[in-house]
Amino acid sequence: MQITDVRHHLTTELGSPALFVVIETDAGVTGYGEATIHFFPQAVAGLLDDLRPYLIGEDPRRIEHLWQMCFRTLFMRGGPVTGAAISGVDMALWDIKGKSLGVPVYELLGGLARTKVRLYGHVSGDTAEQMAENARERVSRGITAIRFRGFHVYDREEVHDHQMAVDQQVEFTAAIREAVGPDVDILIECHG
C-alpha cells in the first residue's frame, strides 16, 4: 500500500477554523485527521503542502517512521504549527491502518477503555450577554457541560489589568450559570 495523495480542507462552518487532513492510498483506503489550531490555520495548511511530496509513495502503515520523517524533514521542529500538521497526518495514518486491518483505531491503541465520552461545548464572546447566549445555544443542543476561556481581558495597546480580568471572569461565570441553570457543569480554561 502506498500514499497517493495528501490534501487538506479548511472550514469555518462551526464558527472557528477547523483543518482536516485527507490521505489517500493506492488500495482505495482513505484516512482522515484533524490539524486544527485556532490561530494561523493557513500556516498549518502550508506546512501540510510542504510535507506532501515526502509522504507520497510511502507506506502509510509505517506510522512511526513517517512521523519521524515529517519531524526531521522540517527546519522548524517545534511549536503549534508543526505539532498540528504532524498530528493531522498521524491521525490520518492511524485511520488508514485501522481501516486496512478492519479494526477501529482504539483496538490498535490498547483496546476499549470506556463505552462513551462526555462532550463539552466551548463558548466565547466579548460580553457576559454573548457568553450567556452562546451557552444557552449549546445546552439547547443537548450539551451538559460548558467550557470557556477565562481571564482573557486584554488590550494589545495596554498593560494587562489583572483585576479587570478577575472581575470579568466572575461576571462571565455568573452570566453563564444564570443562563444554563444548576444542572450544567461549567469548565474554565485557564491557559495562556
Language-model-detected regions and their locations in the chain:
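General structural feature for long, well-ordered alpha-helical segments within catalytic domains
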Residues: 47, 62, 66, 85, ...
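Structured beta-strand/loop patches that form or line metal/cofactor-binding pockets in enzymes
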Residues: 1-32, 36
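Anionic group-transfer/hydrolysis microenvironments
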Residues: 7, 36, 92, 149, ...
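Metal- or metallocofactor-binding catalytic centers and their adjacent structured scaffolds
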Residues: 26-101
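Glycine-rich, aromatic-flanked loop segments that form ligand/cofactor-binding clefts
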Residues: 90-126, 130
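Metal-dependent enolase-superfamily TIM-barrel catalytic cores that perform enediolate-based chemistry
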Residues: 116-192
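Short Gly/Pro-enriched turn/cap motifs at secondary-structure boundaries
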Residues: 9-12, 81, 85, 140
